Amino acid sequence: MFIALTNDDGIQAPGLRAMYKALKEAGHTVQVVAPVTEQSAVGHAVTIALPLRVKIFAENGFQGMGVYGTPTDCVKLGLNALLDKKPDIVVSGINAGANVGPDILYSGTVSAATEAAHMGYPSLAVSYDNFKPDDIAAHARFAVEIMESMPWQSLPPRCVLNLNLPDVPMQQCKGLTLCPQTRAVWKDWYDHRTDPRGNSYWWLNGIIPPETVAEGTDRDMLTRGYATLTPLRFDFTDRETLARLQQNMDRQRQGSEDL
């Protein structure tokens, strides 16, 4: 298959390089369009007031196009202008750090995959549950196997598959599980610090409290040592509330008509 590969950690990130190598070793054709610089947690940001510039990277058996922009910029520019042809699948990752529950709202990794899905391409986001991945070659090979096993043609339009890999050696991984995303949210705090010049600044920290994580959700299963796969569809409509509001509005209208 022809795979378009991107990420949000940057084109030189170990996770992307591991995924590139695993895809190539599996016999796939791969073209990379990824940010030149770190773009973690930029969400679905798109550059609209600045030009996008491209830098070619070719080193140690790797070749790719680096974009001075966001992950979504990379996908939009790649699919519209840079790639040799339309890819069979767009893969985003491997991200350093899990993307579970509320993470998907912030994640450049998931947003890149989402943009591809919105443009009509099968897409897979891949993340690893450690912010400082070491040797993840086996995890990358596992991700490729999952990609190859998916029934892409039968998935609904604009569906994104979100794969998270546990922070354990792959031989200790308990397997792949399908699960929903957690509804638990981050508890944030900011450290107030002073730089070497005496200037004040703030540094974000946070945690998803374990006691708030429902059993069987992505954060729970990932912590237990499973790889998790969650299909995502970015329709934010709260249909239950929509129905209740509609009923309330209908009652109000009926009451007005009875006067």
Curated annotation (Swiss-Prot):
Major place of residence: cytoplasm
Gene Ontology cellular component terms for the protein in this record: cytoplasm
Chemical reaction(s) catalysed: a ribonucleoside 5'-phosphate + H2O = a ribonucleoside + phosphate
Entry binding sites for a divalent metal cation: 8-9, 40, 95
Cofactor note: Binds 1 divalent metal cation per subunit.
Classification via Gene3D superfamilies: Survival protein SurE-like phosphatase/nucleotidase (3.40.1210.10)
Pfam family of the protein (one): SurE
E.C. numbers: 3.1.3.5
Primary enzyme class: hydrolase
PANTHER family: 5'-NUCLEOTIDASE SURE, PHOSPHATASE, PUTATIVE (AFU_ORTHOLOGUE AFUA_4G01070)-RELATED
Its job: Nucleotidase that shows phosphatase activity on nucleoside 5'-monophosphates.
This protein's name: 5'-nucleotidase SurE
Organism: Oleidesulfovibrio alaskensis (strain ATCC BAA-1058 / DSM 17464 / G20) (Desulfovibrio alaskensis)
UniProt gene name: surE
